[in-house]
């Protein structure tokens, strides 16, 4: 009995036959698609309609620009803008007063919108609104949700406030008030301080002013106290009025600072400076000064009695009835003068060295003696 074996080629063909059948069957059996899923995919590609209850995600500027661009003439009136917004977005059918007020504000305040008047006027009211040609591309690629930042055009400042001109005009004056040199350096922010003219100075302005030169204290006080001194002298040398007048003369002079060294002191009644002319006309001119320079004590004399000789080098302490610079307040009062005397005269041995009534007249005697004459009032 003989056994038969298949040849190698036949065996290889038999092994490959089932694999080729499998490859042919695989493309013939694709997985079927369910009808539910296919319908859902078609619905997702359809455009969505805006929800009337939801506010559109656009600003009022975008709504206005959208309405103007989609118009036939590229311009619309205010009522035309309202109608376009209501027709395109039903959300704005309610609460018209609120959003229409916002539309008007954006049209007036935004520089992208230009008002164009109607041609010829007529009975029709309202103006057209259009877009500024420089703001045509303010929305990137037609996307109204994103707005570009536009550079505002340069506008010159008003005429009353321009660089290079003075704050008070070219001449540095406005309304009668002038500042010297104000127009030469702009508004004077970095300029050195200016000084006002003397004609415009006022007491109410807190500007430091140089002090005026001090007049003579004796001449300044004599005119104010002449009447009071005459009345006190007529009443009598013992009256308290004369002492009050003489004491008041030293008060104003002491407040003038370094120009006066007069101190307030109580002088005896009836003692008045003979060079001021108070208490009657002087009986005699003052005696000439001595050639020596040491100080002397001042004497009090009655007007009717002849004046004694001045003390010399060998003079001792002053008598009890005299006043000395060392103790002006402790001096004893002089003897009472007759009632018919016009008043006591205050005589000094040397004029430049008055110790009790030391005023600025004697301080500046050497400097201003040529300009001011000694006149008795």
Curated annotation (Swiss-Prot):
InterPro entries: FH_FOXL2, Fork_head_dom, FOX_domain-containing, TF_fork_head_CS_1, TF_fork_head_CS_2, WH-like_DNA-bd_sf, WH_DNA-bd_sf
Record PTM: Sumoylated with SUMO1; sumoylation is required for transcriptional repression activity.
Biased composition (Basic residues): 291-301
Molecular function (Gene Ontology), one example: cysteine-type endopeptidase regulator activity involved in apoptotic process
Biased composition (Pro residues): 305-322
DNA-binding region per UniProt: 55-149
Cell compartments where the protein resides: Nucleus
GO cellular component, one term: nucleus
Keywords: Differentiation, DNA-binding, Isopeptide bond, Nucleus, Phosphoprotein, Transcription, Transcription regulation, Ubl conjugation
Region (Disordered): 1-54, 277-338
PTM annotation (Phosphoserine): residues: 34
UniProt GO BP: anatomical structure morphogenesis; apoptotic DNA fragmentation; cell differentiation; embryonic eye morphogenesis; extraocular skeletal muscle development; female somatic sex determination; granulosa cell differentiation; ovarian follicle development
Position(s), cross-link Glycyl lysine isopeptide (Lys-Gly) (interchain with G-Cter in SUMO): 25
Primary localisation category: nucleus
Role of this protein: Transcriptional regulator. Critical factor essential for ovary differentiation and maintenance, and repression of the genetic program for somatic testis determination. Prevents trans-differentiation of ovary to testis through transcriptional repression of the Sertoli cell-promoting gene SOX9. Has apoptotic activity in ovarian cells. Suppresses ESR1-mediated transcription of PTGS2/COX2 stimulated by tamoxifen. Activates SIRT1 transcription under cellular stress conditions. Activates transcription of OSR2. Is a regulator of CYP19 expression. Is a transcriptional repressor of STAR.
Complex formation: Interacts with ESR1. Interacts with UBE2I/UBC9. Interacts with SMAD3. Interacts with DDX20.
Name of the molecule in the record: Forkhead box protein L2
């Amino acid at each position: 009995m003989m056994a038969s074996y298949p040849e190698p080629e036949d065996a290889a063909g038999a092994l490959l036959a089932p694999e080729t059948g499998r490859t042919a069957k695989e493309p013939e059996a694709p997985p079927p698609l369910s009808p539910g899923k296919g319908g859902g995919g078609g619905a997702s590609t359809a455009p969505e309609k805006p929800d009337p209850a939801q506010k559109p995600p656009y600003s009022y500027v975008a709504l206005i620009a959208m309405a103007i661009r989609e118009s036939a003439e590229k311009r619309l009136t205010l009522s035309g803008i309202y109608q376009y917004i209501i027709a395109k977005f039903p959300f704005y059918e309610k609460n018209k007063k609120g959003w229409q007020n916002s539309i008007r504000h954006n049209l007036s305040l935004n520089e992208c919108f230009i008002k164009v008047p109607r041609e010829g006027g007529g009975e029709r009211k309202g103006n057209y609104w259009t877009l500024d040609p420089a703001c045509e591309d303010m929305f990137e690629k037609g996307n109204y949700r994103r707005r570009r930042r536009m550079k505002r055009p340069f506008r010159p400042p008003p005429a009353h406030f321009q660089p290079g001109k003075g704050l008070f005009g070219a001449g540095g004056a406005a309304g009668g008030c002038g500042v010297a040199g104000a127009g030469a350096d702009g508004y004077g922010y970095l300029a050195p301080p200016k000084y006002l003219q003397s004609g415009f100075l006022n007491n109410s302005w807190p500007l430091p002013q140089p002090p005026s030169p001090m007049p003579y204290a004796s001449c300044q006080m004599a005119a104010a106290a002449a009447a009071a001194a005459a009345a006190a002298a007529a009443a009598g040398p013992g009256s308290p009025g004369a002492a009050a007048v003489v004491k008041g003369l030293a008060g104003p002079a002491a407040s003038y600072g370094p120009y006066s060294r007069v101190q307030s002191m109580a002088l005896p009644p009836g003692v008045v400076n003979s060079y001021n002319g108070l208490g009657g006309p002087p009986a005699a001119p003052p005696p000439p000064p001595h050639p020596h320079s040491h100080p002397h004590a001042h004497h009090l004399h009655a007007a009717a009695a002849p004046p004694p000789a001045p003390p010399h080098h060998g003079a001792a302490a002053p008598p009890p009835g005299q006043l000395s610079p060392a103790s002006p307040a402790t001096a004893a009062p002089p003897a009472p003068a007759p009632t018919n005397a016009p008043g006591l005269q205050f005589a000094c041995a040397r004029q430049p060295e008055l110790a009790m009534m030391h005023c600025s007249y004697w301080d500046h005697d050497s400097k201003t003696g040529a300009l001011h004459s000694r006149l008795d009032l």
